[in-house]
Amino acid sequence: MNSKKHLGHTARKRFGQNFLHDNNVIHGIVSAIYPQKDQFLVEIGPGLGALTEPVGELVDHLTVVELDRDLAERLRHHPFLHHKITVIETDAMQFDFGQLYRDANLAEKKQKMRVFGNLPYNISTPLMFHLFKYHDCIQDMHFMLQKEVVKRLCAGPNSKAYGRLTIMAQYFCQVMPVLEVPPTAFKPAPKVDSAVVRLVPHKVLPHPVKDLYWLNRVCSQAFNQRRKTLRNALSTLFSADQLTELGIDLTARAENLSIADYARLANWLTDNPPADVNKDEMIEHLDD
């Protein structure tokens, strides 16, 4: 028996496909999303429809973004949902969700998008950060991710899980774990445990920075040398006196600072940039 085949479709490794089939888990996720009839829901990576079907039954319309041509075609001809599904066959990493928001006239309707999905684990982090660019257009997001990634997203200061990913995610969103999911809930079963997370974009950013490049840069430099004191880890960006003036304990390490601390450092760097600035780095690359 082919462990990679489910409902007549063979999982494709290049798309990171693991199909959810546990009904208890599916019910738990749909309950967490709590879709309402007239809301604008967008599913990323619907796959074989494990979440698409129960969510689609509860709403007037559902938009799905699917890269796999065969799966997109199956959804277009779904036996009872085809009339209420819009299938966008494209790479979600390249898709303009802001244009989708505008095309649906959601601002006029005083609505925002609700996004959910069982994300391919190999692109989950950059995909989330692509979506954060559209945080003003999104009401909330529910994603299936690796359990370790969810721990990092939800972590607080002074913990091993706390890192650059934590700070950048919580800068944009309130982050809450929803439920844990064992490998047996998927076909083929992944080699890691999974979990569902809820991300709710802040209506007003609690710690706004003037330039996201500098928030990413200072977090990257601090956490890439997380065993060093900040005095040493950030020595190419700040002098010891400057850190002290900014209220930073010179003996602290990267995991000891709050998001507010990092935002303060980033805003200082925006106003006082070092001479050797290279802004070609991308915010999406956030593996600690």
Swiss-Prot record:
GO function terms (MF aspect): 16S rRNA (adenine(1518)-N(6)/adenine(1519)-N(6))-dimethyltransferase activity; RNA binding
Recorded catalytic activity of this chain's protein: adenosine(1518)/adenosine(1519) in 16S rRNA + 4 S-adenosyl-L-methionine = N(6)-dimethyladenosine(1518)/N(6)-dimethyladenosine(1519) in 16S rRNA + 4 S-adenosyl-L-homocysteine + 4 H(+)
A Pfam cross-reference name: RrnaAD
Record's subcellular location: Cytoplasm
Enzyme class: transferase
Annotated InterPro entries: KsgA/Erm, rRNA_Ade_diMease-like_C, rRNA_Ade_Mease_Trfase_CS, rRNA_Ade_methylase_Trfase_N, rRNA_adenine_dimethylase, SAM-dependent_MTases_sf
Keyword field: Cytoplasm, Methyltransferase, RNA-binding, rRNA processing, S-adenosyl-L-methionine, Transferase
GO CC terms of this entry: cytosol
Residues that bind S-adenosyl-L-methionine: 18, 20, 45, 66, 91, 118
Domain of life: Bacteria
This enzyme's EC code(s): 2.1.1.182
Described purpose of this protein according to its UniProt entry: Specifically dimethylates two adjacent adenosines (A1518 and A1519) in the loop of a conserved hairpin near the 3'-end of 16S rRNA in the 30S particle. May play a critical role in biogenesis of 30S subunits.
Homology family: Belongs to the class I-like SAM-binding methyltransferase superfamily. rRNA adenine N(6)-methyltransferase family. RsmA subfamily.
Name of the featured protein: Ribosomal RNA small subunit methyltransferase A
Upper taxonomic lineage: Bacteria, Pseudomonadati, Pseudomonadota, Gammaproteobacteria, Pasteurellales
